[in-house]
């Protein structure tokens, strides 16, 4: 029963009895006396509230007897019309009492007896409201209303003065409350500003703390807005001309669009390559009208200069945009991201990685790809397959178009797919690396690599035994597995000839790719590797191998031509099947992941010195990371701006050295003054100069470490191994152990990708 309801009932009944009190003044005093007694009884009851339910019943009986006495005293003096009012009040009181008794009875039936609370007692006497501490109304107008209600008395001068004083106090209290509220409001606003990032962190989905879905099930609900298509082609201005054989020629819109793709790349090395030019011209002619085909027969006679200059000017104009123009573009992009860049997966908002469909253009490929220069066609809604859940709203295609297909497959992770025209491969729109699906896949990958740790010795013993096998196929497989384990080579995939660049992996090594040296640079049994690896990046390495491996390689190369396969009895299918037999889920990539992660962990233990400062520890980490990148052949060409950035860094180092020399001279001078003066002021100056020297020494060391790091990493790509092959928990544990801020190792994107590892890893984690 609510406190307001009890209060109202007691108020009505009190007013009702007040009318009789004017007629019976003597009885009024008696009632007041009884009221005080009752109040005392109630306070005692409250103190004894921890006693048994039987005591509660006794107190209620006494309470009811008092009520009967009161009713008898009042009824003898009342008029007939007031009897009816009183009967109504009685019925109301009985209902209240009945509800209170029922509650107590219910508690008894449930097998427990709770101590009586004032909140649960029926307000039978009608003279006062229940005390503040027991009844908690939702809202009360002011503090004074919470005091016990007292029967009305005939007003006297003292009462009037008291009331006036209370009103004044109340006004003062209200003013104070208003001021406090304003302060609280301001404080709350400032707190909200401070706490905003925390709130965002709290909202991050900690999927790693939840139970995983059954094997094969990727999601239960998926809804998204579909892809964003490339904008339609905008024809060139009239002033931008295309020339063929020295004459102006107006191209049809389709032919002009493809011509602009070549014009944009005119200064690039690609446009000088014969295969690129040949493929481009062939596909461009397909887009021409018959008249254009008859005229344009030789690419060398085409002049794209004005087109190229127009796009350069456009690029320069974008760079010279005002802040307002740049802000407007940024806002438009953010609006697009907000609408299309997120999906709802299992009641969580997940970021989409690539929601924009790639615009049409010319295919470049990796390395010397045989299809470079071919036209990548514009993708239309009719090429698109949408994947979402059955109960989700299917995204609407652009007006006048329709989707190729809508699927509801929760065993795949892609949202949108289409087939590109160059290689016939399927392209996908997937979730961001920070999503649950990608995070779970990463976690599983590193856990599989950790499982390999338990059986790697057994596998190594097995392939060593197989080096002596009578079967040539088994020997070749064992040597290939040794290279995958020791050198982190890729197993390779089956390729169609002429479809891709001539890149080589372990199973596709040819005789021409290795040289055997019984002795080289003071080492025995050295194998020299030289072949184009993934993305046509050269793999060059001189590795000392075990004697039996060297002898087997000599055997495999017997009576073979340079272009013949080294492992002629082996392919990736045979090797991968063998790996699966050794351990469930084992692939060449698992070996690379295992060797990369274990190398990082070992290198960090060797290189990290406990007494080093943070910049020195970061240098140690990068050196450990570099060892992994070299193992995995993660190379890169030195950045174009490398020399310039190194010169700038060296200038900073030289300037810092000059500052340090000046600071040391100042310190020496201050020490000399302190010896002569011998006062507190000069001592303070010396301390200040000392701190300045220390600060400059630290700054100089940071710059020198940075220069060393850049020089060592100019041709090594650390990011590839950090993102794809190194268990992030090794890095997180190292950071926590040595007090290195995780922000110094992982950037914002990487921290989002590895949020699961950052949250769950302690400093004592071992791979």
From Swiss-Prot:
The active site is at residue 725. Monomer. Interacts with ERCC6. Interacts with TPRN; TPRN interacts with a number of DNA damage response proteins, is recruited to sites of DNA damage and may play a role in DNA damage repair. There is a cross-link at residue 119 (Glycyl lysine isopeptide (Lys-Gly) (interchain with G-Cter in SUMO1)). PANTHER family: DNA TOPOISOMERASE 1, DNA TOPOISOMERASE I. SMART domains: TOPEUc. Residues 24-39 have a biased composition (Basic residues). The modification N6-acetyllysine is found at residues 174, 282. It catalyses: ATP-independent breakage of single-stranded DNA, followed by passage and rejoining. The modification N-acetylserine is found at residue 2. Eukaryotic topoisomerase I and II can relax both negative and positive supercoils, whereas prokaryotic enzymes relax only negative supercoils. Residues 1-23, 40-110, 131-168, 181-201 have a biased composition (Basic and acidic residues). The keyword DNA-binding applies. Residues 1-201 are annotated as: Disordered. It comes from Cricetulus griseus. This is DNA topoisomerase 1. Releases the supercoiling and torsional tension of DNA introduced during the DNA replication and transcription by transiently cleaving and rejoining one strand of the DNA duplex. Introduces a single-strand break via transesterification at a target site in duplex DNA. The scissile phosphodiester is attacked by the catalytic tyrosine of the enzyme, resulting in the formation of a DNA-(3'-phosphotyrosyl)-enzyme intermediate and the expulsion of a 5'-OH DNA strand. The free DNA strand then rotates around the intact phosphodiester bond on the opposing strand, thus removing DNA supercoils. It comes from the Eukaryota. The gene is TOP1.
